[in-house]
Amino acid sequence: MQKLTILLLVAAVLMSTQALIKGGGEKRPKEKIKFLSKRKTTAESWWEGECSGWSVYCTQHSECCSGECTGNYCELF
């Protein structure tokens, strides 16, 4: 029974190693991290002046950090 368990574990390790080699290995997680790190939080966008805060004059939704331009003023949420 122990030999069968060890054999199954070795087979699982070999199969997972082969899948990593064929799938590109560590490239995919790095690409995912780069994609996620490009996004800025609302606070970062506001701090860098890329969007307007609450109750500031606006003409488009994209100008507001909240994404809501109602009645020419940025909404809070």
UniProtKB/Swiss-Prot annotation:
Residues 20-37 form a propeptide. The keyword Flavoprotein does not apply. It comes from the Eukaryota. InterPro entries: Conotoxin. Expressed by the venom duct. It holds the Pfam family Conotoxin. GO terms for cellular component: extracellular region. Belongs to the conotoxin O2 superfamily. This is Conotoxin VnMEKL-0223. It comes from Conus ventricosus.
